[in-house]
């Protein structure tokens, strides 16, 4: 992911929505995702670098909305919630560049568990991953302790409400001004940005 420099900021609001931006761009892209969802991983593989660059260039504010639709498809029964909590920990304790690095790691084929797999990752293993990625020690400890679990559960509940209001029933979902964007076209982001 392209580095964003010191001007970038990450903020988690009272609804658990994580916003990454430089300044206050007019274009705000809302991305809804679940850490076990294969299409979510494919979306990030296809678009993560371009979205990160658009943030780094100050062209968009990226708002990440965490879901846990697929908790029951994980071996532990709560992997999505714990992975969502880990993203909140990184946002709170590390910073915007680390958030996008962690996002990319969570949705990589190496890390993302398969639906209905016999095993997934424990919180301790996610903490070890943060250490491996050179995250600050307090991030690894918070992830291992599942410190942000309550925040992740609240964020997921708000995600359900937002998607229901928008008439969306699945993730990944990309919305701008509460309207779903067709991300099936290769130029969807450049069209939104205007070039």
Predicted regions mapped to residue ranges:
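Structural alpha/beta surface segment adjacent to cysteine/selenocysteine redox centers
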Residues: 41-118
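Loop/turn elements at helix/coil->beta-strand transitions in domains of secreted/extracellular proteins
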Residues: 26-27, 58-61, 96-98, 135-138, ...
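Extracytoplasmic/periplasmic, Sec-exported soluble proteins
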Residues: 24, 39-43, 74-82, 91-98, ...
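Alpha-helix initiation and N-capping motif
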Residues: 48, 99, 123, 136-137, ...
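C-terminal cap of thioredoxin/glutaredoxin-like
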Residues: 127-195
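Short acidic/polar alpha-helix capping motifs at helix-coil junctions
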Residues: 12-18, 90-92, 123-126
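Residue-level detector of short, conserved catalytic/binding motifs and their immediate flanks
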Residues: 35, 84, 172
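Extracytoplasmic thiol/disulfide redox context detector
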Residues: 1-75, 156-160, 190-195
């Amino acid at each position: 992911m392209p580095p964003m420099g010191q001007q970038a900021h990450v903020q988690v609001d009272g609804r658990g929505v994580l916003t990454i931006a430089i300044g206050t761009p007019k274009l705000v892209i809302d991305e809804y995702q679940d850490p076990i969802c294969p299409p979510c991983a494919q979306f990030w593989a296809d678009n993560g670098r371009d979205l990160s660059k658009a943030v780094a260039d100050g062209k968009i504010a990226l708002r990440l909305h965490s879901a846990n639709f697929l908790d029951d498809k994980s071996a532990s029964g709560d992997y999505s919630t714990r992975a969502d909590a880990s993203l909140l920990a990184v946002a709170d304790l590390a910073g915007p560049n680390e958030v996008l690095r962690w996002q990319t790691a969570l949705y990589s084929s190496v890390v993302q568990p398969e639906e209905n797999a016999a095993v997934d990752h424990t919180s301790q293993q996610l903490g070890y991953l943060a250490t491996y990625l050179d995250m600050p020690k307090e991030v690894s400890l918070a992830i291992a302790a599942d410190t942000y679990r309550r925040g992740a559960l609240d964020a997921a509940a708000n995600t359900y409400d937002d998607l229901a209001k928008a008439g969306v029933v699945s993730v990944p979902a990309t919305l701008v001004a509460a309207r779903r964007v067709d991300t099936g076209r290769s130029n969807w982001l450049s069209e939104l940005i205007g070039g």
